Amino acid sequence: MRFFRRKIAIIVILAYAIFSLYAAYNVFFSKRVISRVHRVVKKGSVIIETGKAGEKEWNPWEEDERAHSVVVQKRRDAFRLYRDQAAKNRPKTYKVQIWGKAAIGLYLWEHILEGSLNPSDKSSQWREGEIQSGKIHFSFYTGPAVVQGHVPPDTDSVVLVLNGREQQKISYSVQWLQHVQSLIQARTISRVAVVLLGNEQCNNNWISPYLKRNGGFVDLLFLVYDSPWVNDKDIFQWPLGVATYRHFPVVTLSSQMVKKDRPYLCNFLGTIYKNSSRESLMNLLKQNNMEKDCLMHAREKWLPQETSDTSRQYQMALAQSDLTLCPVGVNSECYRIYEACAYGSVPVVEDVLTPGACAVGNRSPLRLLKDAGAPFIFLKDWKELPVILERERAMSQKEKTERRMRLLEWYSSFRQQMKDRFTEVLEENFFKIT
């Protein structure tokens, strides 16, 4: 029994010793293994450990991925640079509205700027159009329904087309100027130009107070006839153009118009006033028995509107004549000059000054046309006409065709010059573009 107890005691002591040795080994020699469930994570330790683990891991595609990222970034930078450069080089567009409250507005829009109108029906109450010229986007409004306060202003720059030929027209024009002045005071618009059909004797003092040079608000004035005001700084001369108020069309050129033999040497269809240059011209034609060579139709009373028949008759006369006789009226510049050019019929112009306050000098009258090198026939007295017609009879058809072509090319070039000049003056003065 005693032996059995001693054996048990030895086993217990031996087990204790083995356990003690095992515990000592784990404490001093074995690595710690901390359970993920129970371990305490200190702030920032995960980031540090992850970073260290990442450093130890080897990625065989790491260099390729880095190179691809560099290429993608370069492409993005190149596209961004291209986009910025394109935006910088893209021409800036400026907006200008034209309010046509006189018939010469149609000459400006359709014949000079070569814009179209919608609707095309000339009797429409409201017509409008848009066109780009230079850096300016023009929008045009005309017709009886275009009244004060009903034009949608989408810009602060406006060109107003007015008629200042007689008192009734002046009163109407003043109303529009006062309306524009109220828009300036309301800061709706800030830049204004006026295209004015001036008085035929150049008496335009009524508009002077509205000019900015005199304390008004009109920055620029484009003025018809040889006014002494013209300085090519803020006042510019503007062509009279064709009679758009009589619906004179934009003439489309054809080879037949240029090359075809015309049956008449000259034409004159118009109103004959007592004791006028026109009366002297008609008497001269009759005395020299030129009625067969020249297509003539005279009337005693001026009519503001033509019928479709008289309008067609007039245009046919221009198209069938080598020359168009242009006697002076109240002013030397008349619609007939421009209408003859449109049909390639050389204007024979009476080059004399008329009474009034228009400019006097070597370049007047018809200063604008002469400066542009108009290929017209100028005469001081209608007594020179028989010699001119005799010279015409001696010309060959080839010579007449070449002269006709030169006239048509000149008139096209003249209108282009007016378009460029009008656009450039607005660009420089409204938007400071040089």
Swiss-Prot record:
Domain of life: Eukaryota
Keyword terms of this UniProt record: Golgi apparatus, Membrane, Signal-anchor, Transferase, Transmembrane, Transmembrane helix
Pfam entry (one): RXYLT1_N
EC numbers on record: 2.4.2.61
Membrane topology: Single-pass type II membrane protein
UniProt catalytic activity: 3-O-[Rib-ol-P-Rib-ol-P-3-beta-D-GalNAc-(1->3)-beta-D-GlcNAc-(1->4)-(O-6-P-alpha-D-Man)]-Thr-[protein] + UDP-alpha-D-xylose = 3-O-[beta-D-Xyl-(1->4)-Rib-ol-P-Rib-ol-P-3-beta-D-GalNAc-(1->3)-beta-D-GlcNAc-(1->4)-(O-6-P-alpha-D-Man)]-Thr-[protein] + UDP + H(+)
Cellular localization per UniProt: Golgi apparatus membrane
Result of knocking out the encoding gene: Embryos display mild to severe hydrocephalus and significantly reduced eye size, reminiscent of pathological defects in Walker-Warburg syndrome.
Pathway assignment: Protein modification; protein glycosylation
Enzyme class, broadest EC rank: transferase
Bilayer-spanning residue ranges: 8-28
All ranges on the Cytoplasmic side of the membrane: 1-7
Family recorded in the similarity comment: Belongs to the TMEM5 family.
Record-given protein name: Ribitol-5-phosphate xylosyltransferase 1
